[in-house]
UniProtKB/Swiss-Prot annotation:
This is Putative uncharacterized protein YDR203W. Keywords: Signal. Partially overlaps RAV2. It comes from the Eukaryota. Residues 1-24 form the signal peptide. The lineage of its organism: Eukaryota, Fungi, Dikarya, Ascomycota, Saccharomycotina.
């Protein structure tokens, strides 16, 4: 079962992970990307959590990919109903945007 999603949150990655579990989102399969707003604003880093049979891996985007991160931010900022309210979490499902997912991941 492939369940792709992108989560943008002011929480830390650990807090976001716990929050998503509490919301009942299945994290045992597929790929989940969590962006920490503080990391994006400071370093344009992307925190990726790869969930699957290989276990849990957290990695950070390298500097040469910062332009790609900027493009992603620009794309997401134009999305409707985008809100970065206090301690709010925005979950975007890309079920119909596999080409976008391929570029992002």
């Amino acid at each position: 079962m492939y369940w792709p999603c992108l989560v943008i949150t002011p929480f830390t990655v650990g807090e976001s992970f716990c929050l998503l579990l509490s919301l009942g989102i299945p994290l045992d399969t597929g790929i989940l990307n969590i962006w920490s707003l503080s990391s994006i604003s400071r370093h344009l880093e992307k925190l990726s959590i790869m969930l699957g049979n290989c276990g849990l891996t957290i990695s950070s985007m390298s500097q040469e990919h910062s332009f790609t991160a900027s493009l992603k931010l620009s794309y997401l900022s134009s999305a409707p109903n985008l809100s970065f309210g206090n301690k709010s979490t925005l979950i975007l499902l890309f079920e119909h945007f596999h080409c976008v997912l391929d570029q992002i991941l």
